[in-house]
Design a protein with these regions (language model features):
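Extended, amphipathic alpha-helical stalk segments that mediate dimerization
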Residues: 1-75, 83-154
Length: 154
C-alpha cells in the first residue's frame, strides 16, 4: 500500500470514530430543534433508543463508504447520515410534530427527510467533524489523482 493510501485509511478510521461519537449529540440537537419548531415537547426518555437506532442505521454505511477504494463508486458519508434520519422522523411523527413546509426540490431530493434533519456538511453533525471531513476528502482526491497520473504515464 502506498504511503498516501495508508494515510487515507488512517484519516478514514479517525473520521469513522468521530462520526460515531458525534451521532448522539447530532440526534439530540436535531430532535430538540424539530420538536420545538413542530410545536411539541421532547420526551427525553425516547432519545436514547432513537440515538442507537440512528447509529445502527448510519454506521455500517459510513464504514463502507469511508473504507472503500477510491476507484470504487461508494457514495458519500453525508448521504449515509442523511439516509439515517428515519428513526428521528418516526419519533417526531409519533409525538405529532408539525412538518415544516418544503419546496419541490427538497421533496424530490430528500423524500425521506420531511423534518429536514439530514446534514448538508459534516459541521451540521458536529463542528469538530469539519476539519477531519475535509482532510479525508482531500486525501481521497489526492490518491485518486495520483492513480490517474500513474495510469496515464504507466
Amino acid at each position: 500500500m502506498a504511503d498516501d493510501e495508508a494515510q487515507l485509511a488512517a484519516f478514514a478510521e479517525q473520521l469513522i470514530e468521530q462520526v460515531d461519537t458525534s451521532i448522539g449529540g447530532w440526534v439530540t440537537r436535531s430532535v430538540f430543534v424539530a420538536a420545538g419548531a413542530g410545536g411539541v415537547a421532547v420526551v427525553e426518555d425516547d432519545l436514547d433508543a432513537v440515538i442507537e437506532k440512528t447509529r445502527v442505521a448510519a454506521m455500517p454505511e459510513i464504514r463502507r463508504v469511508l473504507r472503500a477504494d477510491v476507484d470504487t463508486p461508494a457514495g458519500s458519508p453525508l448521504a449515509a447520515l442523511r439516509n439515517a434520519v428515519g428513526p428521528m422522523t418516526a419519533l417526531l411523527d409519533r409525538w405529532g410534530a408539525a412538518r415544516p413546509p418544503r419546496d419541490e426540490f427538497l421533496e424530490r431530493q430528500f423524500p425521506g427527510d420531511p423534518y429536514q434533519l439530514g446534514p448538508a456538511a459534516f459541521s451540521d453533525v458536529d463542528e469538530d467533524l469539519h476539519e477531519p471531513g475535509l482532510v479525508w476528502g482531500a486525501a481521497r482526491a489526492h490518491v485518486h489523482l495520483r492513480r490517474r497520473r500513474e495510469s496515464d504515464h504507466g
